[in-house]
């Protein structure tokens, strides 16, 4: 099953997440099919907190991909901002 989920990057105590389309059997930070955005929970000042390609997310959902709980909330946030 294909899932749209967060893949952690960044340094220790400074998380930065890529929003990726991946096979659910792949490791969290492992192989992925496509990168559709990023999420920076510690963004300060005028740094961008969330960037998401909603067209690609919707295309993957139409193909049967499921969203993780956190990504689902981020998609709603991005749709509200757009």
Swiss-Prot record:
Phosphoprotein is among the record's keywords: no
InterPro entries named in the record: Ribosomal_bS16 (IPR000307), Ribosomal_bS16_CS (IPR020592), Ribosomal_bS16_dom_sf (IPR023803)
Taxonomic superkingdom: Bacteria
Single annotated GO MF: structural constituent of ribosome
PANTHER family (alphabetical): 30S RIBOSOMAL PROTEIN S16, SMALL RIBOSOMAL SUBUNIT PROTEIN BS16M
Family statement: Belongs to the bacterial ribosomal protein bS16 family.
Record-given protein name: Small ribosomal subunit protein bS16
């Amino acid at each position: 099953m294909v899932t749209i989920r967060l893949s952690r990057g960044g340094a220790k105590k400074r998380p930065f997440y890529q929003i990726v389309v991946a096979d659910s059997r792949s490791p969290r930070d492992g192989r992925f099919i496509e990168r559709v955005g990023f999420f920076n929970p510690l963004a300060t000042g005028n740094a961008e907190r969330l960037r998401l390609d909603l067209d690609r997310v919707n295309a993957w959902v139409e193909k049967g991909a499921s969203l993780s709980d956190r990504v689902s909330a981020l998609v709603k946030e991005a749709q509200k901002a757009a």
